[in-house]
A protein has these predicted regions:
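C-terminal structured domain segments across diverse proteins
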Residues: 266-269, 275-279, 291-294, 304, ...
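Contiguous mid-protein beta-loop-alpha structural module that forms a pocket-lining wall or clamp
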Residues: 157-212
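Catalytic core of Fe(II)/2-oxoglutarate
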Residues: 144-147, 159-178, 313-318, 322-352, ...
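A short hydrophobic beta-strand segment most commonly corresponding to one strand
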Residues: 109, 127-129, 154, 168-188, ...
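A short, N-terminal "cap"/entry segment at the start of jelly-roll beta-barrel domains
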Residues: 2-101, 199-274, 278, 369-374
Length: 374
């Protein structure tokens, strides 16, 4: 005899479902279940919460803890066998979908000098943020980009792309960021391996940054109609310079310090339709106020050290550490140095939230905008 309860989510609030189980109703619910249907009022309060309830939890992944394990994978598997030699970040609340937070995937990939992964394409949008090493490169639809530390490169939905490290380089580690969980949730994922395993470089090396990377300039013959940025590679040096210059003439955001978004130079919008990226600078000693918003965010420390408080938990971070902020979680950041700035790279699903009209933001009102640490 089943003891299933159907009134678990009752709420004694006007306008909300508040139906108590009775023998007659339970029998009715079972009849509906046999027809592969159900009574909305038994689940309405669950599937339409008062506010977002993320299954993800805040996590800090320390690079000093992960690095040796990432490097060890080199001795255990080859790129040819693994496809992509990656240690992925698995949020305790999202292990069922292999997500780092929300619907975002992240992992650390390593390659030795002279290694190259096979060219492939997939429905997921992706980016790579270089953490250490020199000589890394990525080829996207025949465009080859050379990469240095703190550069990041796009490998958009549907593009042929591959990664490698030149024979003259050093062992490289980078962070992968993809929307795999989102694409799979939408049941829209495809994957393909290039028929030749490697693609030909059909354009001058670093041509796209050269064509599209001019500050405030657009090439006269620059025709681009694809839904993602043609820039492909976003370099650290000009990004950091822009942050520093901006910090000298503005107070910045009370919640994010000096925040700048990477953009598609054609549209001024996000770099890809489903993944946004940004870089923010915290001045020496700066501590932001807390706020929360819809959307999942993954941060990597590009420079400096400090801490973030996420839903009352303090996470101390330093360069190359990675941490996540789940949707609708209060968070604030602080630079621990009194003399040097700190810089955080971030990728997120903000474009999805905004394009679907789901973005909401709220500042913490009490305690002068700062959370109590639990």
């Amino acid at each position: 005899m089943s003891n299933t309860s159907y009134d678990t989510y009752r709420e004694s609030v006007a306008g909300r479902a508040d139906v108590e189980d009775t023998p007659e109703l339970v029998a009715y619910y079972k009849e509906l279940a046999a027809l592969k249907t159900g009574a909305l009022w038994t689940v309405a309060n669950k599937i339409e919460p008062w506010q977002p309830k993320s299954e993800s939890v805040p996590v800090l992944w320390r690079f000093r803890d992960l690095r040796e394990h990432v490097l060890r994978s080199v001795d255990l598997v080859t790129p040819e066998k693994a496809g992509r030699r990656v240690v992925y970040l698995n949020n305790p609340g999202r292990q069922d979908v292999s997500a780092a937070v929300g619907w975002l995937y992240s992992g650390l990939q390593v390659m030795h000098p002279g290694e190259a992964a096979s060219a492939h394409a997939h429905s997921s949008s992706a980016l790579r943020f270089i953490m250490e090493g020199r000589g890394a490169y990525t080829i996207v639809d025949g465009h080859k980009m050379t990469l240095n530390a703190n550069d990041f490169v796009l490998t958009p939905n549907g593009t042929w792309h591959e990664h490698g490290v030149s024979a003259e380089g050093t062992t490289c580690i980078w962070q992968d960021g993809l929307d795999i969980p989102l694409v799979n949730a939408l049941e829209a994922g495809f994957y393909a391996v290039h028929p030749d395993l490697q693609q030909a470089v059909t354009h001058a090396v670093d041509d796209m940054p050269a064509i599209w990377g001019g500050k405030g300039l657009r090439p006269h013959d620059g025709n681009w109609s694809k839904p993602y940025s043609p820039l492909f590679k976003y370099e650290w040096a000009p990004t950091y310079e822009a942050l520093v210059r901006h910090s000298k003439v503005t107070e910045g955001s009370p919640f994010d310090g000096v925040l700048m978004h990477y953009i598609n130079p054609v549209t001024g919008g996000p770099v890809m339709p489903t993944i946004g990226a940004s870089m923010q600078l915290l001045r020496p000693g700066e501590a932001t106020r807390a706020h929360r918003h819809t959307g999942s965010f993954i941060y990597q420390v590009a420079k400096g050290s400090g801490y973030s408080i996420i839903n009352g938990q303090r996470f101390d971070w330093t360069e190359r550490d990675i941490f996540c902020v789940p949707s609708w979680a209060f968070h604030e950041h602080a630079n621990a140095s009194a003399s040097d700035d700190a810089v955080l790279f971030c990728f997120n699903d903000l474009p999805v939230m905004q394009s679907l009209g789901l973005y909401r933001e709220q500042a913490l009102a009490e305690n002068d905008g700062h959370q109590a640490v639990l």
